[in-house]
């Protein structure tokens, strides 16, 4: 298996795209991470993870570092602020264009973790993707309505409370310094994500464009949405299932909970759904077969 780092030079920033492949003419997969993380949710320094797994099994894999995350520079700071729409109006189109310049066409499959699914769907609401064959969500939700102690502590107190205070006072969210996440977030990006997470309506914060209504009018590709049985707050099954309903609940959508009760090896949570050492011999195999079909 080969890997390489590709860079997209913009006027005031650089985007990083990590590629894993065993053969260049393989079908392509585009992977997008979520909030307070970077593309390494899909791979490790030692070459393990979902992205290398796909490459070893016949796919040409491209992993995004959205603006300011991972090797995309500069990182967020008081002087480097940007909003959430930068991800789906600028970064994702740039990544897709880069993949097209290499492959000759747009990526065949799109995969997301957590909030990355919202970015991809927001992009699709306003753009066509005629070459797109399928999508996979790992723990992707758009809003959080579940009520339990973990949600109260992690989402309400930590995210909406303490992290909002940090972002406003420091000018960005220093998630790495405070061990809240693996990547820092720009202030406006973080605050705007929170507004969508708390809102019943999926509307643009600038002009009121209704993303859900737009997506419901489209014929979307097959979507496989999975989440961990032990994901109690960030990607709770109830909230992840509701995202599929919000975008039209088409017949070609499939939703699965990954846990012992469903026949899997572990009750996975929001992170180890992608990072657990047993995942490649558990649900990764199922996702692989789904992509190949």
Task: For the regions a language model picked out, list residue spans one by one.
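N-terminal cap/lid segment of alpha/beta-hydrolase-fold proteins
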Residues: 1-22
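Short, surface-exposed "cap/lid" segments of acyl-processing enzymes
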Residues: 22-75
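Alpha/beta-hydrolase active-site loop
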Residues: 81-100
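Alpha/beta-hydrolase-fold enzymes
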Residues: 101, 105, 111, 115-206
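Short beta-strand/loop motif that positions the catalytic acidic residue
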Residues: 225-227
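Acidic beta-to-alpha connecting loop that harbors the catalytic carboxylate
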Residues: 229-232, 271
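Conserved alpha/beta-hydrolase "acid-adjacent" motif
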Residues: 232-239
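Catalytic active-site module of serine/aspartate enzymes centered on a nucleophile-bearing elbow/loop
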Residues: 251-293
